[in-house]
Swiss-Prot record:
This is Conotoxin Bu1.4. GO terms for cellular component: extracellular region. It comes from the Eukaryota. Belongs to the conotoxin A superfamily. Residues 25-48 are annotated as: Disordered. It is found in: Secreted. Residues 24-46 form a propeptide.
């Protein structure tokens, strides 16, 4: 019974360690800044004048040249 208890304890420690590593917050993919959420997808992004240059943009687009 001693060997089985030792194995169960080892498995328990491995599970606890794995959960700790997985749940540890990682900031590798972001620059650490909180970006403001947008309702529009990236393809409908507007330029500094508020113009959407994608032909399928849902709102009125600016006319003229870029």
């Amino acid at each position: 019974m001693g060997m089985r208890m030792r194995m169960m304890f080892t498995v328990f420690l491995l599970v606890v360690l794995a959960n700790t590593v997985v749940s540890f917050p990682s900031d590798r993919d972001s620059d650490g800044a909180d970006a403001e959420a947008s309702d529009e997808p990236v393809e409908f992004e507007r330029d500094e004048n508020g113009c959407c240059w994608n032909p399928s943009c849902p709102r009125p687009r600016c006319t003229g040249r870029r």
